[in-house]
Amino acid sequence: MGFLNKLFDDNAREVKKYQKKIAAINDLEPEIKALSDEQLRAKTDEFKQRLENGESLDSLLPEAFAVVREASWRVNGQRHYDVQLIGGMVLHDGRIAEMRTGEGKTLVATLPSYLNALTGRGVHIVTVNDYLARRDSEMMGRIHQFLGLSVGLIVHGLNYAQRRESYAADITYGTNNEFGFDYLRDNMVTRPDGLVQRELHYAIVDEVDSILIDEARTPLIISGEADKPTELYNRIAMIIPRLKPEEDYNVNEKDRVVTLTEQGVSRVETMLSVENLFDDLHTELAHHVNQGLKAHALFKLDRDYVVKDGQVIIVDEFTGRLMFGRRYSEGLHQAIEAKEKVKIEKESQTLATITFQNYFRMFEKLAGMTGTAMTEEPEFKKIYKLDVVEIPTNMPMIREDLPDVVYRTEEGKFKAVVEEIIERHKKGQPVLVGTVSVEKSERLSSMLERRGIPHQVLNAKFHEKEAEIIAGAGLKGMVTIATNMAGRGTDIILGEEVAPLGGLHIIGTERHESRRIDNQLRGRAGRQGDPGSSQFFLSLEDDLMRLFGADNITGMMDKLGMDDSVPITSKMISRSVETAQRRVENRNFEIRKHVLDYDDVMNLQREVIYAQRRQVLMGGNIQESIADMLEKVVRETVDMFGAQSPYPEEWDLNSFLEYVENVFLPNHDITAEQVGSMEKEEIVEMLLERAQAHYKTRETAFGEEIMREIERAVMLQVVDKKWMDHLDAMDMLREGIGLRAYGQKNPLVEYRREAYDMFQGMISSIQEDTIRYIMRVTPQVTEQKPEEPQHVRTNRDEEQPARPVHNEGPQIGRNDPCPCGSGKKYKKCCGADS
């Protein structure tokens, strides 16, 4: 308890600090109120001028906040409460503001976004879906536009020109997916005029827990079609149903793993007519079997995905929303398509990928807001260096949170939920019921239909009406069934006569793995001092209770001889449930941390490649880079053949000269006798001199301008192809690295070491291929058209080998971070030997 007391003391102290500035803002109110619309708008230019003259944003804050507050009142009829001003200051300081549902987070964001947009460097306001981004940009954008700032919107379906214009605005509203994908696309363009994003200056993330924690494990992936047949998926889908659970395979639901038993392996081998499923010849077949098993045993229709218009659409486990465009990777999505007998889409190859963790950590300043962040504060601090400040509510919270009730079976629980709904419906009290899946919401809906209770259902199948359904959930007599946190971001306003009936009543039908998600459901009631209540109905058959320790409760119920219809409520049960949730939360945090440890390795490599690619794209000194590459390739070629013997006459000179011709000196007239009579360093000098002369001849023939254009196009094309292959190779490395633990080796250390070697190999391969093409390519004169996006899709998938290593390493500064991911400087780590 001492820790909790300290936590609340610290929070109160932080809030008190901000409250001192509130007085200054409030004191300015009469003066600002007296300004005309034109004078109020002119304040924006005045602030910009004062910034140029050396004033800081912090010193402008009281006046800027007072201006936004007044503009909001004039434009939208909304005046920021004092607690909302505190929220705005917390966001300006690059922290997370925890504000209860209904406290007006969207309005809060207008304060720091206006202040930080005065720098002219852009502000991103990030929301979880297109509807909220569009709504907020329209409603809150009016305030900014009134004050002379431009507002942009980034949602699905915009063309290149619209995106570029939106990013150029002072304040840009959009979704996390669109911002992330645009960043990846920007690192795939081949001309500078194809770029849409500006620098990553300041981001305010709404529902920050959903984006930075719940979605942290899901990378954003842009992929293109891979040339792989799909027949094998159907073949596997036909044999999996013939296998018997426990006899042929074991399912570990807790870790989401399925494994074949020995009997299962031999049955699969018989059905597929192969001798050994796990030998090197059948690696791909074994992978298909594994994915087929997962598709049938772990992934359930109407829980993990739905089938809509002949397509398998993933359901977001946290919000219950359909995730259009997202696909499971590594052939799993195709395995599910085969299971559901719908058209199997071709597999894809990853072109670019990044996690939300690494995308948002690139912003110079990051802030967030949510109704529930305190339970995850350690993770926000450790991974994003973000503090959480709990903002006091404007009105006291009077919602009544009733103790959980637990039933032995799920059937008993749902019957009790229906009776509770009927009881409250009789007196006209609105009820919002939260379920964990589409399947459970439909089950409850049919039970209510049988009892003649009118109700509305909001799940992944009815997402189009989400905001409309949620907004009406507070009307008298309304019964709404919603999956998880669907409708988050839309306020539930109580209808007339509802407050005396007790306000909105929330029923949770299952505890989520995370206490935070449960708190979000409870938080739908009791907004802005409204009355309300909440209660969770649980059963021992719920996933959380079944998988994470309800044995002691089951034993107790057995001893008491309790039947299905009798609930049990006790503090011990509530404690057991909370202990199980803490256990799962810690486990999930470790998984996310583990993912990040591996992704950090890839992230450093991505930063090196993207930085060098951007340099080439923007017309950096390409000629100098080519000259360096040429020398490296010549030296590496001589070193590679020279490894056989220090004496050139003992080398395989015919192969050597063939390689030289193939890579950097086409149509040369050098003979084996010439090379055999020279010293190693003389060979390097002679080859380099001739290669440079050949390069110069080509440059003179084409002209410098065309030569630079050729070099730029070749380098970008080669880098993109090699990076794409490298991503696949890294995926394969990652997939198999866990097995190193059996050899008493640390998989992460091994991954870093091998990833670094592969990165070195890729850089060497980029240099060699770039030189090969530049020494051969003939320019074709074509009309230049505006850059159009490539035919790619955004989601996720897989496979390709890496090139062996023989080079001096990438062009990394000695003081740069080492791409192996150790966190040390290059000169102190992998560069120590060079």
UniProtKB/Swiss-Prot annotation:
Region (Disordered): 780-834
Principal subcellular localisation of the protein: membrane
Recorded topology in the membrane: Peripheral membrane protein
EC number: 7.4.2.8
SMART domains: SecA_DEAD, SecA_PP_bind
Subcellular location: Cell membrane; Cytoplasm
GO aspect biological process, one term: protein import
SUPFAM superfamilies from the UniProt entry: Helical scaffold and wing domains of SecA, P-loop containing nucleoside triphosphate hydrolases, Pre-protein crosslinking domain of SecA
GO molecular function list: ATP binding; metal ion binding; protein-exporting ATPase activity
List of residues binding ATP: Q84, G102, E103, G104, K105, T106, D491
Catalytic activity field: ATP + H2O + cellular proteinSide 1 = ADP + phosphate + cellular proteinSide 2
Binding site for Zn(2+): C818, C820, C829, C830
Biological role stated in the UniProt entry: Part of the Sec protein translocase complex. Interacts with the SecYEG preprotein conducting channel. Has a central role in coupling the hydrolysis of ATP to the transfer of proteins into and across the cell membrane, serving as an ATP-driven molecular motor driving the stepwise translocation of polypeptide chains across the membrane.
Family designation: Belongs to the SecA family.
Protein name, per record: Protein translocase subunit SecA
